[in-house]
């Protein structure tokens, strides 16, 4: 009704204002398109909340009420403050109590509450997302990385993630990607973590991965995912399926190579510990090597590592477990997953993502970093504000796991709404930090 009335009023006004009907219709379409999409998205979010209301019935009544009020994502934390500051203040006090803050502590927004995983205590719940820099030489982080990550740590976030740090030269996405497979890499990262720990109160996490079939490509601004014009290296994946028609076809990784790469992940994990990282993350998303096993769009194997979800998860879980065993028990470890391939039932679905998250949690994951897509060029993502947060909500509230929301989250208001509603435990923000 709101959409129909507002659209009718807008069209009537334009017909009155414009000299011709065609001009009025053209302007109407341009002006209303974005607002219509926003309203449709809000309506869809609201409908889905009520359809899945059982998911939220175990929430505390305070959080359940907040979740219902903000279900459409049109009403935010600060909107509620304007409407009922007393109630929101009591809700924020409740959240502080859940975070372990004393009753006499000054009132603060959810994003400024502490969060603990194993022995790592974060001062707040804002995370700097992994952002590729393409500035390493032979995998070595240098002054650029020191300044970039040092500035992000000084900026106030509780936790800073590195860009994907690769386990081998062949496992790099581009020639500019950093690594953890040589002593020079370890020394470069140690220099960086020492700065973070001595000059800031942030923690730092190393995201570790292997490019798989998306490797041997140009640095971002020279053509994302485009193959190198020269100096290419061989790539491998779960199956011999090229990323796109322009990329080379990877070789199907053999059992011996799987064992070798798993050992490289362990070596990188040990280096990350010696380099002073507080936390590590296995990158099992976005179509890279580990992700290529999980998604049926890139895994057509007929052995024990293909077919059912349990089979497709076999090697990713072997890698994760080996890393977890090599990583100190008092330090946390997360995993990034693609919770939706955006190709319907042909790929990983949100329902499967719940099972994937549970499997990693059973292997020792302390946090599920919930991303989506980038697993196939055929994906049809539905973009918008906080567009991946519903997957974090799904996994957190149906699997009962700690999650981190990421994806087009760019305001403090977004972060507070996500946290207060119980849609995630941490919120990762990228470009706004820049």
Tell me the role of every PLM-derived stretch:
Residues 18-21, 38, 49, 56, ...:
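Generic macromolecular interface patches on structured domains
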Residues 47-69:
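C-terminal domain-closing interface element
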Residues 20, 60-65, 84, 142, ...:
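Helix N-terminus capping/helix-initiation residues
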Residues 44-45, 411:
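Sparse recognition of residues in long alpha-helices and their boundaries
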Residues 1-44:
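Conserved mid-domain beta->alpha element of the FAD-binding
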